[in-house]
From Swiss-Prot:
Pathway: Amino-acid biosynthesis; L-tryptophan biosynthesis; L-tryptophan from chorismate: step 4/5. One of its GO terms (biological process) is L-tryptophan biosynthetic process. Keywords: Amino-acid biosynthesis, Aromatic amino acid biosynthesis, Decarboxylase, Lyase, Tryptophan biosynthesis. The keyword Flavoprotein does not apply. The gene is trpC. Belongs to the TrpC family. Its EC number is 4.1.1.48. This is Indole-3-glycerol phosphate synthase. The lineage of its organism: Bacteria, Pseudomonadati, Pseudomonadota, Betaproteobacteria, Neisseriales.
Length: 260
């Protein structure tokens, strides 16, 4: 595990402890049970595939540790509507505050503005956060293999599925495959950003494709335009998580539209 990931996870453990003190586990489970009905995240992706279109998971991200502030003019509901109008399949919303300037309020605002399913993009280290995600209205959660042990991955996936949510499993390299062998989610993402160097290469996804046969593979990071989309589609990858390229655009709707 890298130094930056270690720092993030240490801070996250403190954050979750404080959240549990404010809203106990029993209460967060009750809130999750009362949340608005789940929208099918994987269903929306498959719907695009049936139309022979790339399925774009469009990200709402204000900042990142590597790039700092990405979009000063940050209006989550407006961004969500632009994504929906442009043909995105789903949304991904950052809820991590210390490193990504995210917020659960951004997720709620985005989901209320559109009919698309929404992923909570965060560092999930406790099943409490899975219930919390559903309570906030999320339809899917991200589980990062590099951040979790096998037992945690399996338990958190089971909780998410019990709540009707989709799990997006995120891999970085082949060394993480073994601990994920029992997971049943159909949605497997490959982050093209090297956790050690922060360099981005689409080869990360390509190198893992043989091991992910039969999965719906999501390529994450490094997709900058239609040429990248067409290249990955030629290799059998039809689902794309894209954030920074859209967030830096003056006209987000037009930028997304360029991919189709």
């Amino acid at each position: 595990m890298t130094d930056i990931l270690n720092k993030i996870l240490t801070a996250k453990a403190q954050e979750v402890a404080a959240q549990k003190a404010a809203v106990n586990a029993e209460h967060i489970r009750a809130l999750a049970a009362e949340a608005a009905p789940v929208r099918s995240f994987i269903g929306s992706i498959r719907g695009k595939h049936r139309l022979n279109l790339p399925a774009v998971i469009a990200e709402i991200k204000k900042a990142s540790p590597s790039k700092g502030l990405i979009r000063p003019d940050f209006r989550p509901a407006e961004i969500a509507r632009a994504y929906e109008n442009a043909g995105a399949a789903c949304l991904s919303v950052l809820t991590d505050e210390p490193y990504f300037q995210g917020s659960p309020e951004y997720l709620k605002q985005a989901r209320e503005a559109v009919s698309l399913p929404v992923l909570r993009k965060d560092f999930i280290i406790d099943e409490y956060q899975v219930y919390q995600a559903r309570a906030w209205g999320a339809d899917a959660v991200l589980l990062i293999a590099a951040a979790l042990e096998q037992e945690q991955l399996e338990r958190f996936e089971a909780v998410a599925h019990e709540l009707g949510m989709t799990v997006l499993l995120e891999l970085h390299d082949e060394s993480e495959l073994e601990k994920c062998r029992n997971l049943t989610t159909p949605l497997w993402g490959v982050n093209n950003r090297n956790l050690r160097t922060f360099e981005v290469s689409l080869d990360q996804t390509l190198s893992l494709l043989p091991a992910l046969e039969g999965k719906t593979v999501v390529t994450e990071s490094g997709i900058t335009g239609k040429a990248d989309v067409e290249f990955m589609q030629s290799r059998g990858v039809h689902t794309f998580l894209i954030g920074e390229t859209f967030m830096r655009a003056d006209n987000i709707e037009a930028e997304v539209g360029k991919l189709f």
